[in-house]
Swiss-Prot record:
Its main location: cytoplasm. HAMAP family: 16SrRNA_methyltr_A (MF_00607). One of its GO terms (molecular function) is 16S rRNA (adenine(1518)-N(6)/adenine(1519)-N(6))-dimethyltransferase activity. It comes from Aliivibrio fischeri (strain ATCC 700601 / ES114) (Vibrio fischeri). This is Ribosomal RNA small subunit methyltransferase A. It catalyses: adenosine(1518)/adenosine(1519) in 16S rRNA + 4 S-adenosyl-L-methionine = N(6)-dimethyladenosine(1518)/N(6)-dimethyladenosine(1519) in 16S rRNA + 4 S-adenosyl-L-homocysteine + 4 H(+). Specifically dimethylates two adjacent adenosines (A1518 and A1519) in the loop of a conserved hairpin near the 3'-end of 16S rRNA in the 30S particle. May play a critical role in biogenesis of 30S subunits. It holds the Pfam family RrnaAD.
Length: 272
């Protein structure tokens, strides 16, 4: 067996795909327990890789879907003695994948995966677009990204990703994972998070473009006052009418306050 630390089960990890293969049985068991896959559910794995999570999930269910960009790995799964007949394999990029094609009536998507860390944030933004059709999502991510997803106002980790994730989903960190659980070991700690989209959004925005804009502008200038940060969009009086203290910093605004600003702007400005 090779002594290289980037070869696992005969497959060399590809840097351009951000591949790190999970190989710690304790961690794998923890993830599968958190997902709790049941027969008949509409399960979708993103980036199954060498099947560390795919195999134990396959022991619990009859059929599920996987999306894999690496052709060699997709081929391996196709020829897998136990999984081959259970899997529907989509070869391609999850960032461009239209998840509506997997929707089944009264059977929402349950999405999971050990996401390549180099695309995890844009991929989550892509997945949020399908929130109405998703029951839950379980992802292995960089621990720092999980901290950002779960952060509260006023903390260093709080940012645009936090606000947009918490707009769509309840966020629950599940499990911390050390680099030694992977081949090759990544240079960062990892963690598993559960994202559960709301049936009814707690603070609905009338136009997501405005919400995205106030988040971007706020977090790009997080140390400025709200008044200075948004002076091209809202006056001090308008902010006060919305219950927002003009002298606070954008990093201290709550999700509800960001949505209130976005909805006011949508009603009173044409989006630029």
């Amino acid at each position: 067996m090779s002594t290289r630390n980037d070869v696992h089960l005969g497959h060399k990890a590809r840097k351009r795909f951000g591949q790190n293969f999970l190989n710690d049985p304790y961690v794998i068991d923890g993830i599968v327990s958190a997902i709790n896959p049941l027969p008949g559910q509409n399960l979708v794995e993103i980036g199954p890789g060498l099947g560390a999570i795919t195999e134990p999930v396959g022991r619990e269910v009859d059929k599920f879907t996987v999306i894999e960009l690496d052709r060699d790995l997709a081929e391996r799964l196709r020829n897998h003695p136990e999984l081959g007949s259970k899997l529907t394999i989509h070869e391609g990029d999850a960032m461009r994948f239209d998840f509506t094609q997997l929707i089944k009536e009264n059977n929402k998507l349950r999405i999971f995966g050990n996401l390549p860390y180099n695309i995890s944030t844009p991929l989550m933004f892509h997945l949020f677009e399908f929130h109405k059709d998703v029951q839950d999502m379980h992802f292995m991510l960089q621990k720092e990204v999980v901290n950002r997803l779960a952060a509260g106002p006023g903390t260093k980790a709080y940012g645009r990703l936090t606000v947009m994730a918490q707009y769509f989903c309840k966020v629950m960190p599940v499990l911390e994972v050390p680099p030694t659980a992977f081949v090759p070991p990544p240079k960062v700690d990892s963690a598993v998070v559960r994202l559960v989209p709301y049936e009814t959004l707690p603070y609905p925005a009338t136009n997501l473009k405005w919400l995205d804009r106030v988040c971007r502008e706020g977090f790009n200038q997080r140390r400025k006052t709200v008044r200075n940060c948004y002076k091209a969009l809202l006056t001090k009086e308008q902010l006060e009418e919305l219950g927002i203290n003009p002298s606070m910093r954008p990093e201290n605004l709550t999700l509800e306050q960001f949505v209130n600003m976005a909805n006011w702007l949508d009603a009173n400005h044409s989006a630029e």
